[in-house]
Design a protein with these regions (language model features):
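Long, low-complexity acidic/proline-rich regions
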Residues: 128-132, 182, 186
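A short, surface-exposed beta-strand/turn
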Residues: 76-88, 161-183
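Long, charged/polar, surface-exposed segments that mediate recognition or autoinhibition
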Residues: 82-125
Length: 191
């Protein structure tokens, strides 16, 4: 009985530790391999875009399909499940473009948690009904029936250890979650 309890505890701890990690591997795919529902949605969102790139993304939670494109000097990422159901829409953002409240709360969180940090990438993330998000991106309609978060990728140093992290903050800059990014080990050189 004692050994069984120890085994269950070890499994639960491993699961909790795994939940705080992030690993992604993206593979470029042809648009013909993407669910028509996803292709149609992205094409209606960005009808003038000629360079939509599709990716199969494998992560610790499963597999998703992602469309990436550049529009009006921003990079958009639209994520779907393999059947074409929308997960979220993300757009790159500069730190000084964030609302002042968000800038202050994010900076306070990072300064409190790390001795030093460097922000690598910021994305504004929208989730909600696909039609509402379509109106938001195409027309700028904001009826606030969607969720806005900020996804921030950065390096942070704690004591002597430096690692890469991805944190999610709500629309006010309140911390939601942080995952340590698992770097991909390669047995060959990248040029």
């Amino acid at each position: 009985m004692k050994h069984c309890l120890l085994l269950i505890t070890a499994i639960l701890l491993a699961h909790v530790a795994n939940a705080q990690k992030k690993f992604e591997r993206e593979t470029r795919i042809k648009s013909a391999k993407v669910a028509e529902k996803a292709r149609t949605y992205v094409e209606s969102l960005f009808p003038d875009s000629k360079k939509i790139k599709w990716y199969l993304e494998e992560n610790l939670e499963g597999v998703t399909i992602e469309a990436k494109l550049k529009e009006n000097r921003s990079i958009y990422s639209i994520e779907f499940d393999t059947l074409g159901t929308l997960h979220d829409i993300e757009r790159t953002q500069k730190f000084d473009q964030l609302p002042m409240e968000v800038q202050g709360n994010v900076t306070a969180y990072l300064k409190k948690r790390y001795k030093s940090f460097k922000i690598k990438k910021i994305q504004i993330q929208w989730t909600g009904d696909p039609d509402v998000l379509h109106a938001l991106i195409r027309k700028g309609d904001t009826d606030n029936t969607f969720t806005t978060n900020y996804e921030i990728v950065y390096t942070g140093r704690e004591d002597k250890d430096t690692a890469s992290y991805e944190s999610l903050f709500d629309r006010h800059g309140k911390h939601i979650e942080t995952k340590e990014i698992i770097e991909r080990n390669l047995n060959h050189l990248l040029y």
